[in-house]
Amino acid sequence: MADSCAENAAKGTENERPKEVEASADTVPQVEEGVEEYLKRKNMVLLDYEKQMFLDLVEADGLLVCAKGLSYDRVVISILKAYSDSGNLVLVINSSDWEEQYYKSKIEPKYVHEVASTATERERVYLEGGLQFISTRILVVDLLKQRIPIELISGIIVLRAHTIIESCQEAFALRLFRQKNKTGFVKAFSSSPEAFTIGYSHVERTMRNLFVKHLYIWPRFHESVRTVLQPWKIQSIEMHVPISQNITSIQSHILEIMNFLVQEIKRINRTVDMEAVTVENCVTKSFHKILQAQLDCIWHQLNSQTKLIVADLKILRSLMISTMYHDAVSAYAFMKRYRSTEYALSNSGWTLLDAAEQIFKLSRQRVFNGQQEFEPEPCPKWQTLTDLLTKEIPGDMRRSRRSEQQPKVLILCQDARTCHQLKQYLTQGGPRFLLQQALQHEVPVGKLSDNYAKESQTRSAPPKNVSSNKELRREEVSGSQPPLAGMDELAQLLSESETEGQHFEESYMLTMTQPVEVGPAAIDIKPDPDVSIFETIPELEQFDVTAALASVPHQPYICLQTFKTEREGSMALEHMLEQLQPHYVVMYNMNVTAIRQLEVFEARRRLPPADRMKVYFLIHARTVEEQAYLTSLRREKAAFEFIIDTKSKMVIPKYQDGKTDEAFLLLKTYDDEPTDENAKSRQAGGQAPQATKETPKVIVDMREFRSDLPCLIHKRGLEVLPLTITIGDYILTPDICVERKSISDLIGSLNSGRLYNQCVQMQRHYAKPILLIEFDQNKPFHLQGKFMLSQQTSMANADIVQKLQLLTLHFPKLRLIWSPSPYATAQLFEELKLGKPEPDPQTAAALGSDEPTAGEQLHFNSGIYDFLLRLPGVHTRNIHGLLRKGGSLRQLLLRSQKELEELLQSQESAKLLYDILHVAHLPEKDEVTGSTALLAASKQFGAGSHNRFRMAAAASRRGRR
């Protein structure tokens, strides 16, 4: 099935395969012998198409885009081994944790260096050479501070290159590297062709950010790939499992409601592009993420009905997935959540449709019979799986004359929940497992049906080692399992619908407790699918497959495994195949990547047809499951066609690799015009040319390198100086200090009072403090909540605005800047620095510390300054006169109201200050008038209350200046 689907996807595009592969094919025979000897010496076993990938990237830097499952990881390992030498310094960036651990395990430890925690230690490690897996944020700071010898870097390897955008830290590091190193290599890898179809000119922009000129395209239908995999084709058997009438009807009704909502959202929003909103996309794509990205910029302009429909489409899709993949009891419990009165009043109205009523009715019928007795229907694939394990596979072993061997079966599932479901079914039987699910989900069982009771009575005592202690402990842990990084959309949906208090394992090893005969008598065996004939192997808790197999040397092995795991990612399947060497693989769910991994694994083994593993595909024909699989193939094929077409039309400048200074001429430079004849003619006669202007500098706090703004500032030609500062985030000039806040950070800082303290420090040390409120460029330039369906109301937004108003009242010198995106912020910083002096890093680092800066004279006690500023009648325009002439706090308390009026130059301010110091004034409830608004501002920002002022005033009588 895998080959046929891939071959069908390749029709019409075989003539459009990458030209660089064809062009380099003639050069392969000339170096073939040398390459084979080199790979053998380095102990690198590669398939023919992997060798070609390796040769292409060694010959010229470039971006390699391959199909999922073709495993470019061996090519990466080969390149890492080729540069494994203490005389080379190779950096690997943008790798996930499991990728880093996997690659490190394949390289000699003496060439791999761990990243040190201190800057001094990192400088020493850099000079030792070898391979470095380093965080991009640390790398950027070290490059800016010149802790790493940039000119000595041999090259950089970039993984997951489809995520490299102009403003990301990886692009920043590559730009810093290429500006000072013109000889090092850049080799990038990606296995996500669909990502390059999003946005305008994504392929060209990614290559420009990577500083590469060559694009290598390797789809599954590439001629070299087909030539390698076709001779070792896996034995695939496609088994169409029929679904029950109830599931078919539920699926039809859900699709009917989704179609109605799609038409409704298009009718309401005729002026908005809703091309991506189709029933097919709602079912098979990451619909909610795509639609959210499309509507984010106008989300605040949409009416409430549209927002409810978008949320309901996601819910309906979850119901569809739950019906297809979960057991009947879990699906019914999930459906019940959306039949409550509270939800009926908060959705778009789909629960009132006749189709919705049928969905709830049919879901209940899957659990209870006509007499309302508990009789849940089993999952359609359960019986087929049991037949495979007890009849088909033993019979095939007998027919192939491998009776003396114990079969090893690998069952692949989509997610950990399905894996746990199958483990419970195989070890406990269907009736017992479904009854446990009913009790767990609080489904009222009531009375058991006669048929179900008889099936349950066939159960004997619970089998030994049904589940290990570790599994029991994990199931008792509260809190649902978070979605894995990199998990595909189906697994995310399944994890979203998990009940709270559950945590599922990703691998189980089982063995048969009732061995099935493989002789002639096996034909008459009719095993009871509801009686457990399997038990778990506890040794797999330590992820030791070898020990698990050794513990049961004469029994069949059955391994349950997810397509990818949190610990090893997509490498988990390849690792399991190498350790287990299965005879049979059962694809309980469909996955394109896993199918190709099986093909590549079989091509590496090069076994005769009789010894190759058999792969059984369990699939519901003409259902959403089959449609999702075929759509994923079609999307990948269309993505590769788009990339191939883009490459044929792409114009790549010769300087794009950054090895000449032409690549950086587009960056803003602040040097004078070149001293050519035209430039000299424009100068006044006899005048000497002006001195070269200094590149503008911006001091950036180290914590700000988590954002995109430092990268964009550098791209505009400003020099970025990373520094640990305690006041502000960006220092533009000696007088301008900027505190940057995103919307979510702004709300949190206003509520906690942290922003108030930050403004106090900025106003104390800088003449022009600035609060920068920066919006996400992909979100509307409008105050709203963080999430797509925000619970923030206009009242909550008004509360934020009121707090900002109080902040500006309390700090008159504070300026607010509203920026729609980091790009606009970078341009604004450049304009603010025009004609201004440069900031001093030493002065900026010393401000806010306990020790005064060089030449700074502390005129006033900062504690007294802050205390007086909080008193009514005292503000920034009169506090300095009060501090100079008021003497001490004790003398201030002894002054009359007339004397205070002379100090403050205001009768009203003097009265307010005198009353707060001498009169037992307690404000009435809800009374905030006149200048006492400043007191309210102090309360808003956690600065204290009137009682605290009275206590402080009493204490100040005993204080000294």
From Swiss-Prot:
Belongs to the XPF family. SUPFAM superfamilies: Restriction endonuclease-like, RuvA domain 2-like. NCBIfam families: rad1. Implicated in recombination events during meiosis, mostly in meiotic exchange. May directly resolve Holliday junctions within recombination intermediates leading to DNA exchange. Also required for the repair of mismatches within meiotic heteroduplex DNA and for nucleotide excision repair. It comes from Drosophila melanogaster (Fruit fly). Heterodimer. Interacts with hdm. Residues 1-27, 451-485, 674-693 are annotated as: Disordered. The keyword Zinc does not apply. Residues 697-777 form the ERCC4 domain. One of its GO terms (biological process) is resolution of meiotic recombination intermediates. Its main location: nucleus. The keyword Ligase does not apply. Residues 458-469 have a biased composition (Polar residues). InterPro entries: ERCC4_domain, Restrct_endonuc-II-like, RuvA_2-like, XPF, XPF_nuclease. Its EC number is 3.1.-.-. It is found in: Nucleus. It holds the Pfam family ERCC4. One of its GO terms (molecular function) is single-stranded DNA binding. Keywords: DNA damage, DNA repair, DNA-binding, Endonuclease, Hydrolase, Meiosis, Nuclease, Nucleus. GO terms for cellular component: nucleotide-excision repair factor 1 complex; protein-containing complex. This is DNA repair endonuclease XPF. Residues 13-22 have a biased composition (Basic and acidic residues).
